[in-house]
Regions:
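Short, charge/polar-rich alpha-helical segments
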Residues: 1-16, 47
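Amphipathic alpha-helical coiled-coil segments
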Residues: 21, 48-66
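Short, charged, amphipathic alpha-helical segments
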Residues: 11, 39-50
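Heptad-repeat coiled-coil alpha-helices
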Residues: 19, 26, 30-33, 37-40, ...
């Protein structure tokens, strides 16, 4: 993978991670506002976010030469 492509992938993954964080936060707030609980859904979303975060960290490490 060329460095340029890796940087583009990193930028895309960072945006995806940020959007997922915002969505997760909004979901937590809405559940709280409605007085509802959905731990399984929150766990599922957190796992998905964790996978994207791992991708971001791996790309950052690769680009930093670690």
């Amino acid at each position: 993978m060329t460095d340029l492509r890796a940087w583009r992938d990193l930028r895309r993954k960072r945006r995806e991670r940020e959007a997922m964080l915002l969505d997760l936060g909004a979901l937590v707030y809405e559940l709280h506002r409605l007085g509802r609980r959905a731990p399984e859904l929150l766990q599922e979303k957190a796992v998905e976010l964790g996978k994207v975060d791992q991708d971001v960290r791996a790309l950052e490490d690769a680009l930093d030469g670690r």
